[in-house]
Amino acid sequence: MLKKISIFFVAVMLAGCSSISDMTSYIPFMGKDKKVINLDKDKIDQKSYAAAYEATVATYKDRVNKNFFVDNFASGANDWYLGRIVVPIKQIQDKLYTGGHDSDVYAYYSGVLHAEALQTNFSRLSANCWQKVDSPSVTQGIYDAMRDLQQGKERGENDAYIFQGSEMLLKACTGQ
């Protein structure tokens, strides 16, 4: 009887251990290097990516260090663009600015606020500008910018890809 129980226990343990590696593809922040979003290069809309990257670098330069929760920040931005945030922005701002949050929670909601502000600014260029933007590419631009800032290797204003993409967005949204 003890032998049967032992064999059953070992079989369950082996099955459980083998499925843990499979779970990393379903659980956020496990497995891959880019844990939040990792679009293929051919799936990235240059104008959306570049504008988000440039705005994020301009906003967060000298504010991101190696301990900043970049994945949480990008997850907050991603959740905003996916429509997962049901709490009004004003309420998030009020709670965030009163303090008392753990760094990871603060980073997440900062990402939500950054994404909302970026979307609002796109809409200020023209009423239909946001419809011309690819939100996954925006999220990728935000995420890459935050990761680059964390490593001190952000792309500059003179980067051809970023410059051309930003110009493309201005033309698409303002017609100039």
Named regions from a protein language model:
Residues 1-4:
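Positively charged n-region of N-terminal signal peptides that target proteins for export
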Residues 6-7, 27:
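Short non-domain terminal segments
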Residues 7-15:
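Bacterial N-terminal signal peptides
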Residues 18-176:
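Intrinsic-disorder/low-complexity detector
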